[in-house]
UniProtKB/Swiss-Prot annotation:
GO BP: any one term: small GTPase-mediated signal transduction
Protein name per the record: Rab GDP-dissociation inhibitor
InterPro entries: FAD/NAD-bd_sf, GDP_dissociation_inhibitor, RabGDI
Biological source species: Pyricularia oryzae (strain 70-15 / ATCC MYA-4617 / FGSC 8958)
Function recorded in the entry: Regulates the GDP/GTP exchange reaction of YPT7 by inhibiting the dissociation of GDP from it, and the subsequent binding of GTP to YTP7.
One term under GO cellular component: cytoplasm
Taxon lineage: Eukaryota, Fungi, Dikarya, Ascomycota, Pezizomycotina
């Protein structure tokens, strides 16, 4: 093990994806990084577990039993605790390509992107239309609405914020997305799947935000571009699950001189004049344990290391389910995302279903892993909140559901304390909100915008 330096530019606590992207990018940019995790594995709350570890985590069995044994080899299972897909033209994909982390991972397309209309047994599950031709074929709309949707999608494709001739007479600096929808005469159900299954908004707040239309149009366009990249769906997902994503960035950091320490507890944060200047820590799992102290210009980390500096902003509910069949209504897709917009089932928050299978090497052949997620809206009976999603799954072989998971956000921006804290992973089934957080932390910590495009050039220059 290499010697601990007396001082680093950055100390990072926790090996979740947000933290690993930041340590990788900062290392590439020439910063001296020490990256620590109290666990013996990478990933933090977003790790991937085998089936036995999942049973043990949730306590779904009695002492002396081994319920996982009937599901084949343990090593064939890689189950994500936080289910998320990557948009093929999204920010995380751009960061992966720009940093060349793609060389450590293999991605495969997610077979379908679906949305539910209505509720209960009679609900319609259909592919989210991503272009004008699909809009005309979609069972989600009547014949006249299909034409309105077709003209809306075509307009999104030609829209240019800098060219008022493409603005349909709307003042984009002040108009709302409701004004845009009304311009095309779109029905409520159509607005629902555009806003929630294409633009991927979590609630309907975006509709009435003055000046918010350009952002919504960008998000709809990102969806369309991501579908166009590979066809079928806008999502991709790594073979063997998401657990390898943080490790890919950890490798990147290590190549550029980053130091990684697992099994290491933080005993104390050191302050001078109210600003964090270092840590006291103990590395366990070795004889004898190694106690050390080191300093840093700034400290980044996940909320679990800073309980006095974060607040709870909500709770996420997740049920991890093992199935022996694909989801109904998805044309037997081996993997898919299904979004149930909140208004369809009388809720304030959407319900997300992410389904993967042996096609992505996360379980043995013949099995499917479906994870249902939403934001808690009540204080009890949380399984009832997930019920509209669980109903879509058919017969469930095993179901793992713990108590509501708190969502944390930092209380302050970190500029005065020198501590920059990430947000918890939300209920969305994609990484766009995570990369927003990465960029936000980078901006707060360095005072600069994170420019993804030039990262590979920096690396090449550093390799010479």
């Amino acid at each position: 093990m290499e010697e601990i330096a007396k001082e680093y530019d950055v100390i990072v606590l926790g090996t979740g994806l947000t933290e690993c992207i930041l340590s990788g990018v900062l290392s590439v940019k020439g910063k001296k990084v020490l990256h620590i995790d109290r666990n013996d594995h990478y990933g933090g709350e977003a790790a991937s577990l085998n089936l036995q570890a999942l049973f043990k985590k949730y306590g779904n069995y009695n002492s002396g039993e081994e319920p996982w044994a009937k599901y084949g080899r343990n090593t064939d299972w890689n189950i994500d605790l936080v289910p998320k897909f990557l948009m093929s033209s999204g920010e995380l994909t751009n960061i992966l390509v720009s940093t060349d982390v793609t060389r450590y991972l293999e991605f495969k397309q997610v077979a379908g992107s679906f949305v539910q209309q209505g509720s209960g047994p009679k609900a319609t599950v259909a592919k989210v239309p991503s272009d004008a031709a699909e809009a005309l074929r979609s069972p989600l709309m009547g014949i006249f609405e299909k034409r309105r949707m077709k003209s809306f999608i075509e307009w999104v494709g030609t829209f240019d914020l800098k060219d008022p001739a493409t603005h349909k007479g709307l003042d984009l600096s002040s108009c709302t997305m409701k004004d845009v929808y009304d311009k095309f005469g779109l029905e409520t159900g159509t607005k629902d799947f555009i806003g929630h299954a294409m633009a991927l908004y979590l609630s309907d707040d975006y509709i009435s935000k003055p000046g918010g239309a350009p952002e919504a149009i960008d998000r709809i366009r990102l969806y369309g571009n991501s579908v166009a990249r590979y066809g079928k769906s806008p999502y991709i997902y790594p073979l063997f699950g998401l657990g390898d994503l943080p490790q890919g960035f950890a490798r990147l950091s290590a190549i550029y001189g980053g130091t990684y320490m697992l099994n290491t507890n933080i005993d104390e944060l050191l302050y001078e004049d109210g600003k964090a200047v270092g840590i006291k820590a103990t590395m366990t799992g070795i004889e004898p344990e190694m106690k050390f102290e080191t300093r840093a210009k700034m400290i980044l980390g996940d909320p679990s290391y800073f309980s006095d500096k974060v607040k709870v902003v909500g709770h996420v509910l997740r049920a991890i389910c093992v199935l022996k069949h694909p989801l109904a209504g998805t044309s037997d897709a081996d993997s898919c995302q299904l979004i149930i917009p909140q208004s369809q089932v009388g809720r304030k928050n959407d319900i997300y279903i992410a389904c993967v299978s042996s096609a992505h090497s996360v379980c043995p052949k013949g099995y499917y892993i479906a994870i249902v997620s939403t934001i808690a809206e009540t204080s009890a009976n949380h399984h009832l909140e997930l019920q509209p999603g669980l109903e879509r799954l058919g017969k469930i072989e095993e179901q793992f559901m713990g108590p509501p998971i708190p969502l944390y956000a930092p209380i302050e921006d970190g500029t005065s304390s020198g501590i920059f804290i990430s947000k918890s992973y939300d209920a969305t089934s994609h990484f766009e909100t995570t990369t927003d957080d990465v960029k936000d932390i980078y901006r707060r910590a360095t005072g600069e915008e994170l420019k993804v495009e030039g990262l590979r050039d920096l690396q090449v220059a550093g390799d010479e």
